[in-house]
C-alpha cells in the first residue's frame, strides 16, 4: 500500500497509526534478516504510534531514515565503526518536521560508510541485498532506504544524495528518488560528506508519496544557512493538466548503455510525446568530464569534513599510546573506501597541487553550471538515464574506478545544484531500470508533475519486489 493511501485510511478511521506501525514492524522482523536494509529499529515505535494524534497530516506513516541523518535518541552510525555507538542528542530538521506532522521513524537504514559508495558494499557492518535479486547490489549509498521501499518494509524513506546516492539506488530498486535543488531541504543533522554537494532527498514508491514527503520536509531553516526560502507546493503542483513542456534528451548520455536502458529510454520518449511534450536532442558538452571533477571536489571536501573524527571530540576513541597514537588508532577504523577518498582529497588540496586539481575542478564546475543554465533557456526538462545499466552483482566493481563510473550520469545535478528525479521506467530481464529528469534551479515541482504524468500513463507506480505477502 502506498503512503498516501495509508494516510487516507487512517484519516477515515479504518486503521490506526498503531496498527500500521505493528504491520510494518512485523514485516521488517520477518524479511529484513535476509535483506539487510536496516541497521537498527526504533524500539519505541509502538509506544510512539499509540500516542500520535491520528488527525495530524502524516499520522500513520512510518519512515525509514538513512543512518547518516541524525535522529534524537536513536543510534546514528553513518555506516561506520567510528560512530557505531553514537546516539545524537539532536534531531535533523527534516526528521523533526516529519515527526511534528505525525510521522514516525521506523528505523535507520544501511549505507556505504559516510555515504561514500555506489553499492552499499562499503557499509562497515554488512551489505544490503537487492530485493529483486539477492545476488546483486541495491545501489548506494542510500541502498538500505531503496531496498526497504522495494521490499515494502516501509512506505516512505529519506536518503541523501551527494553524487547520485538517492537516484542510483532508486533506479536499481525500481522506486522513485528525488535529489532536490541544493538547499531545498535543510541539511541540518546530515552527517557531512561533501557539504557543497550533499542534499537530503525523499524516496518512495509513487510520485504522490514524494510530494507528501517534500511538502513536509522542505522549506527554509535557520539552522542551515544554505537552505532556500522557497515555500513547498508539491502536492498542489500535481493537480490540473500537464502544461506543455519542452523535453531535451541529453546527447552525451545516449551511448554505451545496456539494451534495457536503451529500450526504456525509447519507450519513455514515446510516452512523453503522447503526453504532449515536445522532444528534441540537446547537448550538454561538459557532462562526460563531470565525473572527473566530482572525484576531485567531493574527496577534497570529505578530507576536511572527516578530519574531525580523531577520537578527541568526535568519533569512537580507540586505544593508543598518548594522543598521537590514539588519533592514529581511531582513524584506522575508517573503511578502505573512506581512507581512499580522504587521501585523494588531502592530495588535491596540498599546496603544490591545489590549483592543478582543485582550482581547475572548481572552474569546470562553473562552466558545467553555465552550460546547464543555457540549456534551460531552450528546454524545460532534461531526460537521461539514471545509470547506464541495471543493478550489478556483488563484487563486480572491485576496481574503484569501475565503481566511480556508476555515478556517470548523476553527478551533474550535484555539481550544478539542480533538482533531479529518478523514476522507474521498465525492466531489463527481472531487474528494474530507471531514468532521470532534471529541471532548472528551484523547479522541483515541475519534475514531480512530469513524473506523475508518466507514472499514470504507464502504471509504473506500485513496483515491489516479490518478497512475502503484500501489506
Curated annotation (Swiss-Prot):
Keywords: ATP-binding, Ligase, Nucleotide-binding, Protein biosynthesis. It comes from the Bacteria. The active site is at 66 (charge relay system), 141 (charge relay system), 165 (acyl-ester intermediate). Its EC number is 6.3.5.7. One of its GO terms (cellular component) is glutamyl-tRNA(Gln) amidotransferase complex. Heterotrimer of A, B and C subunits. It catalyses: L-glutamyl-tRNA(Gln) + L-glutamine + ATP + H2O = L-glutaminyl-tRNA(Gln) + L-glutamate + ADP + phosphate + H(+). GO terms for biological process: translation. InterPro entries: Amidase, Amidase_CS, Amidase_dom, AS_sf, GatA. GO terms for molecular function: ATP binding; glutaminyl-tRNA synthase (glutamine-hydrolyzing) activity. Allows the formation of correctly charged Gln-tRNA(Gln) through the transamidation of misacylated Glu-tRNA(Gln) in organisms which lack glutaminyl-tRNA synthetase. The reaction takes place in the presence of glutamine and ATP through an activated gamma-phospho-Glu-tRNA(Gln). Also acts on Asp-tRNA(Asn). It comes from Thermus thermophilus (strain ATCC 27634 / DSM 579 / HB8). This is Glutamyl-tRNA(Gln) amidotransferase subunit A. Pfam families: Amidase (PF01425). It is an enzyme of class 6 (ligase). Belongs to the amidase family. GatA subfamily.
Amino acid at each position: 500500500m502506498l503512503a498516501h493511501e495509508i494516510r487516507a485510511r487512517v484519516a477515515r478511521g479504518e486503521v490506526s497509526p498503531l496498527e500500521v506501525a505493528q504491520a510494518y514492524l512485523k514485516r521488517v522482523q520477518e524479511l529484513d534478516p535476509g535483506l539487510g536494509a536496516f541497521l537498527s529499529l526504533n524500539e519505541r515505535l509502538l509506544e510512539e504510534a499509540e500516542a500520535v494524534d491520528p488527525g495530524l497530516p502524516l499520522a500513520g506513516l512510518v519512515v525509514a531514515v538513512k543512518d547518516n541523518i541524525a535522529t534524537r535518541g536513536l543510534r546514528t552510525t553513518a555506516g561506520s565503526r567510528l560512530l557505531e555507538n553514537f546516539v545524537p542528542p539532536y534531531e535533523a530538521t527534516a526528521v523533526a518536521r516529519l515527526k511534528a506532522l505525525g510521522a514516525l521513524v521506523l528505523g535507520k537504514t544501511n549505507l556505504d560508510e559516510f555515504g561514500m559508495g555506489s553499492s552499499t558494499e562499503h557499509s562497515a557492518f554488512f551489505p544490503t541485498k537487492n530485493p529483486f535479486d539477492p545476488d546483486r547490489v541495491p545501489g548506494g549509498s542510500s541502498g538500505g532506504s531503496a531496498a526497504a521501499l522495494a521490499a515494502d518494509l516501509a512506505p516512505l524513506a529519506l536518503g541523501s544524495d551527494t553524487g547520485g546516492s538517492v537516484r542510483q539506488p532508486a533506479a536499481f530498486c525500481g522506486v522513485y528518488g528525488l535529489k532536490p535543488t541544493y538547499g531545498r531541504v535543510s541539511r541540518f543533522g546530515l552527517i557531512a560528506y561533501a557539504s557543497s554537494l550533499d542534499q537530503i532527498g525523499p524516496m518512495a514508491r509513487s510520485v504522490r508519496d514524494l510530494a507528501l514527503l517534500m511538502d513536509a520536509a522542505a522549506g527554509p531553516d535557520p539552522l542551515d544557512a544554505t537552505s532556500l526560502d522557497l515555500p513547498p507546493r508539491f502536492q498542489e503542483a500535481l493537480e490540473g493538466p500537464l502544461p506543455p513542456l519542452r523535453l531535451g534528451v541529453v546527447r552525451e548520455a545516449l551511448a554505451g548503455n545496456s539494451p534495457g536502458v536503451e529500450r526504456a529510454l525509447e519507450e519513455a520518449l514515446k510516452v512523453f510525446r503522447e503526453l504532449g511534450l515536445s522532444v528534441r536532442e540537446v547537448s550538454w558538452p561538459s557532462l562526460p568530464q563531470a565525473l572527473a571533477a566530482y572525484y576531485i571536489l567531493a574527496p577534497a571536501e570529505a578530507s576536511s569534513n572527516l578530519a574531525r573524527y580523531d577520537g578527541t571530540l568526535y568519533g569512537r576513541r580507540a586505544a593508543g599510546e598518548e594522543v598521537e597514537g590514539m588519533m592514529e588508532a581511531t582513524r584506522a577504523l575508517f573503511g578502505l573506501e573512506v581512507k581512499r577518498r580522504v587521501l585523494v582529497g588531502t592530495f588535491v588540496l596540498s599546496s603544490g597541487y591545489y590549483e592543478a586539481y582543485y582550482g581547475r575542478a572548481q572552474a569546470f564546475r562553473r562552466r558545467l553550471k553555465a552550460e546547464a543554465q543555457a540549456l534551460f533557456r531552450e528546454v524545460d526538462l532534461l531526460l537521461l538515464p539514471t545509470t547506464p545499466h541495471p543493478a550489478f552483482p556483488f563484487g563486480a566493481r572491485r576496481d574503484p574506478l569501475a565503481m566511480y563510473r556508476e555515478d556517470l550520469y548523476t553527478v551533474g545535478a550535484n555539481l550544478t545544484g539542480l533538482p533531479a528525479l529518478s523514476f522507474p521506467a521498465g525492466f531489463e530481464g527481472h531487474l528494474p531500470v530507471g531514468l532521470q529528469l532534471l529541471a532548472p534551479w528551484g523547479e522541483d515541482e515541475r519534475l514531480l508533475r512530469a513524473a506523475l504524468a508518466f507514472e499514470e500513463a504507464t502504471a509504473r507506480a506500485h513496483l515491489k519486489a516479490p518478497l512475502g505477502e503484500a501489506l
